[in-house]
Protein backbone atom coordinates (compact mmCIF):
# COMPACT_ATOMS: atom_id res chain seq x y z
CA UNK A 1 0.00 0.00 0.00
CA UNK A 2 1.20 3.51 -0.77
CA UNK A 3 1.17 6.33 1.79
CA UNK A 4 1.91 10.05 1.73
CA UNK A 5 3.19 12.25 4.54
CA UNK A 6 2.39 15.96 4.24
CA UNK A 7 5.46 17.89 5.35
CA UNK A 8 4.84 20.55 8.01
CA UNK A 9 5.37 24.18 7.01
CA UNK A 10 8.74 25.14 8.46
CA UNK A 11 10.38 28.31 9.67
CA UNK A 12 12.96 29.70 9.24
CA UNK A 13 12.98 29.71 5.44
CA UNK A 14 16.43 28.09 5.19
CA UNK A 15 15.23 25.07 7.20
CA UNK A 16 12.10 24.82 5.07
CA UNK A 17 14.28 24.32 2.00
CA UNK A 18 15.66 21.11 3.55
CA UNK A 19 12.48 19.93 5.26
CA UNK A 20 11.40 17.29 2.72
CA UNK A 21 14.86 15.74 2.47
CA UNK A 22 15.18 15.65 6.26
CA UNK A 23 11.72 14.09 6.54
CA UNK A 24 12.65 11.37 4.06
CA UNK A 25 15.86 10.61 5.96
CA UNK A 26 14.04 10.48 9.31
CA UNK A 27 11.41 8.15 7.88
CA UNK A 28 14.08 5.80 6.51
CA UNK A 29 15.94 5.75 9.83
CA UNK A 30 12.76 4.91 11.74
CA UNK A 31 11.91 2.22 9.20
CA UNK A 32 15.32 0.56 9.59
CA UNK A 33 15.80 1.01 13.35
CA UNK A 34 12.26 0.49 14.65
CA UNK A 35 9.99 -1.02 11.98
CA UNK A 36 12.19 -3.75 10.53
CA UNK A 37 12.59 -2.02 7.18
CA UNK A 38 8.83 -2.10 6.50
CA UNK A 39 8.77 1.30 4.77
CA UNK A 40 10.21 1.15 1.25
CA UNK A 41 10.41 3.19 -1.96
CA UNK A 42 10.65 6.48 -0.07
CA UNK A 43 10.30 9.47 -2.41
CA UNK A 44 9.93 13.24 -2.20
CA UNK A 45 6.94 14.25 -4.32
CA UNK A 46 4.81 17.31 -5.01
CA UNK A 47 1.03 17.22 -5.43
CA UNK A 48 -0.39 20.57 -6.47
CA UNK A 49 2.91 22.31 -5.58
CA UNK A 50 2.69 20.92 -2.02
CA UNK A 51 5.56 18.82 -0.68
CA UNK A 52 4.95 15.24 0.44
CA UNK A 53 7.10 12.26 1.29
CA UNK A 54 5.60 9.07 -0.14
CA UNK A 55 6.42 5.47 0.71
CA UNK A 56 5.19 1.90 0.42
CA UNK A 57 4.29 -0.16 3.48
CA UNK A 58 2.05 -3.01 4.60
CA UNK A 59 -1.17 -2.07 6.38
CA UNK A 60 -0.06 0.07 9.31
CA UNK A 61 0.11 -1.63 12.70
CA UNK A 62 0.01 0.31 15.97
CA UNK A 63 3.79 0.76 16.19
CA UNK A 64 4.28 2.02 12.64
CA UNK A 65 1.16 4.22 12.78
CA UNK A 66 2.30 5.89 15.99
CA UNK A 67 5.85 6.50 14.77
CA UNK A 68 4.66 7.93 11.46
CA UNK A 69 2.28 10.21 13.36
CA UNK A 70 5.15 11.61 15.41
CA UNK A 71 7.87 12.19 12.85
CA UNK A 72 9.19 15.73 13.15
CA UNK A 73 7.85 16.73 9.73
CA UNK A 74 4.44 15.06 9.92
CA UNK A 75 1.63 17.55 9.37
CA UNK A 76 -0.83 14.99 8.03
CA UNK A 77 -0.75 11.34 6.95
CA UNK A 78 -2.66 9.83 4.01
CA UNK A 79 -3.14 6.59 2.19
CA UNK A 80 -2.55 7.04 -1.54
CA UNK A 81 -4.48 5.02 -4.13
CA UNK A 82 -3.53 4.21 -7.72
CA UNK A 83 -5.54 7.17 -9.01
CA UNK A 84 -3.55 9.56 -6.82
CA UNK A 85 -6.39 10.16 -4.36
CA UNK A 86 -5.35 10.99 -0.79
CA UNK A 87 -7.38 9.60 2.13
CA UNK A 88 -6.51 11.16 5.51
CA UNK A 89 -5.54 8.91 8.41
CA UNK A 90 -5.86 9.75 12.08
CA UNK A 91 -2.67 10.93 13.74
CA UNK A 92 -1.72 9.18 16.97
CA UNK A 93 0.36 11.82 18.66
CA UNK A 94 2.52 11.15 21.69
CA UNK A 95 2.17 14.75 22.87
CA UNK A 96 0.92 14.99 26.44
CA UNK A 97 1.14 18.78 26.76
CA UNK A 98 0.18 21.80 24.65
CA UNK A 99 2.48 22.41 21.70
CA UNK A 100 3.33 25.98 22.70
CA UNK A 101 5.64 24.47 25.32
CA UNK A 102 8.20 24.01 22.53
CA UNK A 103 7.22 26.90 20.26
CA UNK A 104 6.40 29.90 22.45
CA UNK A 105 9.95 30.80 23.49
CA UNK A 106 11.72 33.14 21.07
CA UNK A 107 15.35 34.12 21.54
CA UNK A 108 18.55 34.49 19.56
CA UNK A 109 20.30 31.17 18.99
CA UNK A 110 17.29 28.96 19.68
CA UNK A 111 17.47 25.66 17.81
CA UNK A 112 14.55 25.13 15.45
CA UNK A 113 12.04 23.04 17.41
CA UNK A 114 11.32 20.85 14.37
CA UNK A 115 14.99 19.90 14.20
CA UNK A 116 15.09 19.29 17.96
CA UNK A 117 12.18 16.89 17.57
CA UNK A 118 13.93 15.16 14.65
CA UNK A 119 17.13 14.74 16.68
CA UNK A 120 15.11 13.38 19.60
CA UNK A 121 13.25 10.91 17.37
CA UNK A 122 16.36 9.60 15.64
CA UNK A 123 18.08 9.11 19.01
CA UNK A 124 15.05 7.32 20.46
CA UNK A 125 14.83 5.12 17.36
CA UNK A 126 18.41 3.95 17.89
CA UNK A 127 17.78 2.91 21.49
CA UNK A 128 16.45 -0.36 22.84
CA UNK A 129 13.37 1.52 24.08
CA UNK A 130 11.97 2.67 20.72
CA UNK A 131 9.01 0.30 20.88
CA UNK A 132 8.05 1.19 24.45
CA UNK A 133 5.54 3.80 25.57
CA UNK A 134 6.77 4.65 29.03
CA UNK A 135 8.40 7.62 30.67
CA UNK A 136 12.12 7.57 29.87
CA UNK A 137 14.83 9.58 31.60
CA UNK A 138 16.34 12.06 29.14
CA UNK A 139 19.46 14.18 29.64
CA UNK A 140 20.59 17.23 27.70
CA UNK A 141 24.10 17.92 29.02
CA UNK A 142 24.36 21.28 27.18
CA UNK A 143 20.75 22.31 27.52
CA UNK A 144 20.74 26.08 27.05
CA UNK A 145 17.21 27.36 27.59
CA UNK A 146 15.70 23.91 27.46
CA UNK A 147 14.39 23.21 23.95
CA UNK A 148 15.26 19.51 24.29
CA UNK A 149 13.88 19.38 27.83
CA UNK A 150 10.57 20.76 26.62
CA UNK A 151 10.40 18.21 23.79
CA UNK A 152 11.04 15.39 26.25
CA UNK A 153 8.20 16.64 28.47
CA UNK A 154 5.91 16.92 25.43
CA UNK A 155 6.42 13.21 24.80
CA UNK A 156 5.77 12.32 28.44
CA UNK A 157 9.38 11.73 29.48
CA UNK A 158 11.36 12.95 32.49
CA UNK A 159 13.83 15.67 31.47
CA UNK A 160 17.17 16.64 32.99
CA UNK A 161 19.36 19.49 31.79
CA UNK A 162 22.79 20.80 32.68
CA UNK A 163 23.95 24.24 31.54
CA UNK A 164 26.87 26.41 32.63
CA UNK A 165 25.27 29.74 31.63
CA UNK A 166 23.43 31.02 34.70
CA UNK A 167 21.31 33.35 32.56
CA UNK A 168 19.95 30.35 30.67
CA UNK A 169 19.18 28.61 33.97
CA UNK A 170 17.30 31.66 35.23
CA UNK A 171 15.43 32.08 31.93
CA UNK A 172 14.29 28.45 31.83
CA UNK A 173 13.32 28.46 35.49
CA UNK A 174 11.12 31.51 35.00
CA UNK A 175 9.64 30.18 31.76
CA UNK A 176 8.68 26.68 32.88
CA UNK A 177 7.15 27.85 36.16
CA UNK A 178 5.15 30.55 34.40
CA UNK A 179 4.06 28.10 31.70
CA UNK A 180 2.66 25.48 34.09
CA UNK A 181 0.85 28.22 36.02
CA UNK A 182 -0.66 29.67 32.84
CA UNK A 183 -1.82 26.17 31.85
CA UNK A 184 -3.22 25.63 35.35
CA UNK A 185 -1.33 22.39 35.72
CA UNK A 186 -0.87 20.98 39.20
CA UNK A 187 2.83 21.14 39.99
CA UNK A 188 5.50 21.54 42.62
CA UNK A 189 8.71 23.49 42.02
CA UNK A 190 11.69 23.40 44.36
CA UNK A 191 14.80 25.52 43.90
CA UNK A 192 17.94 24.61 45.79
CA UNK A 193 21.50 23.43 45.29
CA UNK A 194 23.28 20.16 44.59
CA UNK A 195 27.03 19.91 45.18
CA UNK A 196 27.03 23.71 45.32
CA UNK A 197 25.30 24.14 41.95
CA UNK A 198 21.92 25.91 41.61
CA UNK A 199 19.16 23.42 40.84
CA UNK A 200 15.50 23.46 39.86
CA UNK A 201 13.25 20.44 40.40
CA UNK A 202 9.73 20.63 39.01
CA UNK A 203 7.08 17.92 39.01
CA UNK A 204 3.88 18.43 37.04
CA UNK A 205 0.71 16.49 36.46
CA UNK A 206 -0.72 16.21 32.97
CA UNK A 207 -4.11 15.99 34.71
CA UNK A 208 -5.21 16.69 38.28
CA UNK A 209 -6.05 13.01 38.69
CA UNK A 210 -2.60 11.89 37.61
CA UNK A 211 -0.95 14.44 39.88
CA UNK A 212 -2.97 13.23 42.87
CA UNK A 213 -1.98 9.65 42.06
CA UNK A 214 1.70 10.62 42.04
CA UNK A 215 1.97 10.10 38.27
CA UNK A 216 4.04 13.17 37.42
CA UNK A 217 6.52 14.33 34.82
CA UNK A 218 9.76 15.62 36.31
CA UNK A 219 12.15 18.21 34.99
CA UNK A 220 15.49 18.86 36.68
CA UNK A 221 17.84 21.66 35.64
CA UNK A 222 21.30 22.08 37.17
CA UNK A 223 23.34 25.22 36.55
CA UNK A 224 26.81 23.71 36.18
CA UNK A 225 29.52 22.83 33.71
CA UNK A 226 28.70 19.64 31.83
CA UNK A 227 31.68 17.92 33.46
CA UNK A 228 29.87 18.18 36.81
CA UNK A 229 27.43 15.50 35.66
CA UNK A 230 29.71 12.85 37.17
CA UNK A 231 29.40 14.36 40.65
CA UNK A 232 25.73 15.38 40.45
CA UNK A 233 24.14 12.22 38.97
CA UNK A 234 24.74 8.53 39.45
CA UNK A 235 26.13 6.44 36.64
CA UNK A 236 23.60 4.81 34.31
CA UNK A 237 20.87 7.31 35.25
CA UNK A 238 19.58 8.13 31.76
CA UNK A 239 17.95 6.26 28.88
CA UNK A 240 18.68 8.92 26.26
CA UNK A 241 21.16 11.77 25.92
CA UNK A 242 20.13 14.35 23.34
CA UNK A 243 22.09 17.55 22.81
CA UNK A 244 22.93 20.35 20.43
CA UNK A 245 26.70 20.89 20.66
CA UNK A 246 28.08 24.44 20.42
CA UNK A 247 28.56 25.55 16.85
CA UNK A 248 32.02 26.99 17.37
CA UNK A 249 31.64 29.43 20.24
CA UNK A 250 32.63 28.94 23.85
CA UNK A 251 30.32 26.81 25.98
CA UNK A 252 31.71 27.17 29.45
CA UNK A 253 33.16 29.54 31.98
CA UNK A 254 36.67 30.93 31.91
CA UNK A 255 39.40 29.02 33.70
CA UNK A 256 41.71 26.09 33.09
CA UNK A 257 39.46 23.63 34.86
CA UNK A 258 36.28 24.48 32.92
CA UNK A 259 34.85 23.46 29.60
CA UNK A 260 37.16 23.81 26.62
CA UNK A 261 36.21 26.40 24.03
CA UNK A 262 36.49 24.28 20.89
CA UNK A 263 33.65 21.82 20.21
CA UNK A 264 36.10 18.98 19.53
CA UNK A 265 37.83 19.55 22.88
CA UNK A 266 34.53 19.87 24.71
CA UNK A 267 33.17 16.65 23.25
CA UNK A 268 36.42 14.74 23.73
CA UNK A 269 36.50 15.58 27.44
CA UNK A 270 32.74 15.35 28.09
CA UNK A 271 31.82 12.18 26.18
CA UNK A 272 33.35 9.77 28.74
CA UNK A 273 31.23 11.46 31.43
CA UNK A 274 28.08 11.37 29.31
CA UNK A 275 28.71 7.74 28.39
CA UNK A 276 28.97 6.78 32.05
CA UNK A 277 25.60 8.42 32.71
CA UNK A 278 23.88 6.36 29.97
CA UNK A 279 22.05 3.13 30.71
CA UNK A 280 22.63 -0.06 28.70
CA UNK A 281 20.46 0.02 25.59
CA UNK A 282 20.40 3.80 25.58
CA UNK A 283 21.56 6.16 22.86
CA UNK A 284 23.34 9.49 22.51
CA UNK A 285 22.28 11.90 19.77
CA UNK A 286 24.42 14.96 19.02
CA UNK A 287 23.78 17.80 16.60
CA UNK A 288 26.82 19.85 15.64
CA UNK A 289 28.35 22.19 13.05
CA UNK A 290 30.34 20.04 10.66
CA UNK A 291 32.28 23.06 9.40
CA UNK A 292 34.23 23.02 12.67
CA UNK A 293 34.32 19.26 13.36
CA UNK A 294 34.47 16.47 10.79
CA UNK A 295 31.92 13.69 11.05
CA UNK A 296 34.69 11.07 10.98
CA UNK A 297 36.34 12.62 14.04
CA UNK A 298 33.10 12.76 16.02
CA UNK A 299 32.28 9.16 15.06
CA UNK A 300 35.74 8.17 16.29
CA UNK A 301 35.12 9.88 19.65
CA UNK A 302 31.82 8.04 20.07
CA UNK A 303 33.40 4.69 19.19
CA UNK A 304 36.29 5.28 21.59
CA UNK A 305 33.71 5.62 24.36
CA UNK A 306 32.12 2.26 23.65
CA UNK A 307 29.23 3.46 21.50
CA UNK A 308 28.07 1.83 18.29
CA UNK A 309 27.80 4.63 15.73
CA UNK A 310 24.69 4.44 13.55
CA UNK A 311 25.83 4.45 9.94
CA UNK A 312 23.60 4.20 6.89
CA UNK A 313 22.79 6.33 3.88
CA UNK A 314 19.82 7.74 5.79
CA UNK A 315 21.84 8.44 8.96
CA UNK A 316 24.33 10.32 6.80
CA UNK A 317 21.64 12.46 5.12
CA UNK A 318 20.77 15.00 7.82
CA UNK A 319 23.32 17.66 6.95
CA UNK A 320 21.70 21.00 6.09
CA UNK A 321 22.58 24.68 5.94
CA UNK A 322 21.70 26.97 8.85
CA UNK A 323 23.68 30.00 7.69
CA UNK A 324 26.97 30.82 5.99
CA UNK A 325 29.03 29.62 8.97
CA UNK A 326 26.93 26.64 10.10
CA UNK A 327 26.17 23.37 8.36
CA UNK A 328 24.27 21.37 10.94
CA UNK A 329 24.41 17.59 11.06
CA UNK A 330 23.57 14.90 13.59
CA UNK A 331 25.11 11.65 14.73
CA UNK A 332 23.84 8.89 17.00
CA UNK A 333 25.65 6.27 19.06
CA UNK A 334 24.06 3.22 20.72
CA UNK A 335 25.13 1.81 24.07
CA UNK A 336 25.35 -2.00 24.23
Set out the residue ranges of the language-model regions:
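Class I S-adenosyl-L-methionine-dependent methyltransferase catalytic core
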Residues: 1-26, 62-63, 71, 80-139, ...
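N-terminal accessory interaction module
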Residues: 21-88
